[in-house]
Each structure stands twice: as C-alpha cells, then as structure tokens.
Amino acid sequence: RVILVKLADRLHNMRTLEWMPEEKRQRIAMETRDLYAPMAHRFGLNSVKAELEDLAFKWLEPDEYRALAKMVAQTRADRDKLTGEMADPLERRLRENGVVVHEVSGRPKHLWSIFKKMEKRAKPYDEIYDLYAIRVMVENIPECYHALGVIHGAWTPLQERIKDYIASPKSNGYQSLHTTVFGPRGTLFEIQIRTREMHRTAEYGIAAHWVYKAEGKGGKDLDRHLAWFRQVL
C-alpha cells in the first residue's frame, strides 16, 4: 500500500511539474523515467507506467514530444476510422462463432512507446506501421483461446508476434494472449485478448491483487476498492 501511495504521489507531482523550477523539473522527470516508471511496471500498474513515461518524455525531450504529439493528433481521425473498420467486423465474427464477448475496443498507443519504436527502427512516424491496437475482453480463459482461433481463421497472423501470457504470465502477474494480424488496407493490428479479471490486473497490478486478497473475494468490494485507487491516481 505504501508503494501505491508513493506512485500516486509521484503521478500527481508529474501532472503539476510545470510550476517547478527548470532544474528541479528535469531532476524529477529523469527520476520518474528511470525509477518510478519501471517500479510501476514491476508491480503491474501499466496505466500508471504509461502516463509517467509520457509525462517524463514531455519534460525531458520537449521538442520531440511536441512534434510527435502534433503528428499523432493530425492522424487521429484516420486512425479511429481504420480501427473501427477492424474492430466492428472482428466483434461480429467473434459473436457469430459463439465467443462470449464483453468488449472490443481500440487501445491507444502512448507517445513514449511510439517514440521508442521510431528510435529503435530509425524511422519517422509515418513509417511505423504497428501503431494500431485492439483489446478483446471475453468471459473466461477457454474463451480467450476460442477468440484467438477465430481471429486467426479470419485474419492472417504474424507467427513471430503470437504470445501466450496466460500459460506463461509475466513476472508482474500480467496475463493476456497477444497476436498481430493484417487488417484493413494491409495494416498491422496488435490484438490483446483477456478476461475482465486479467484486465484489472493489467491496469492496477498489485493494487488489484492486494484488494482481492484483503477481501478474499471479488465482486462489488473489489470494484469499490479499485474505484478508490483510481480516485487516488
């Protein structure tokens, strides 16, 4: 619980960093990128990690941040349209094949992760093609594998990008099936398939585990405590 409070406090500081002197701002941003974001990742707090990284990026490399944010904003309408062209038929295909689907939605890529891809591949933004992501939430683990089979039957996957983090969870407890397929206009789509419980763990990591263990059950109590944690953040 102490770690959660520390991370929430750091996130609050990063959101208000503009009011601090430049030297202190740089120090805090670097510390956030190098220490607090990896800490959030270690405890499975993926949404916290992503926001900390983006905020650190904003202050440590402001020119690159502004340029990338502008490009992402300019292409948002086209990305949303293309994501819909993939998500709608994907959900329809799953339901037609009897998969119990709770949600199919676009998953935005964070600026820092896009920037790191550009750096690693030495390519500009308009040549990074795996920027599209979709999340599929289903009823249970068998439905995860059922959904994966249906998706691979309808869209061609990249074999080297299929990952089973359900059978082999990450060290922070993260579980999902990952695949990358060719969607509309030959665009690559990264697809995550998970249950709602896996989604809670992916978003809130140790917080979800701590609350679940404390309550000894899920349901309304779990949701109530996670709502508290969201409010803290």
Q: What do these predicted ranges mean?
A:
Residues R1-I3, R10-L233:
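Nucleic-acid processing machinery
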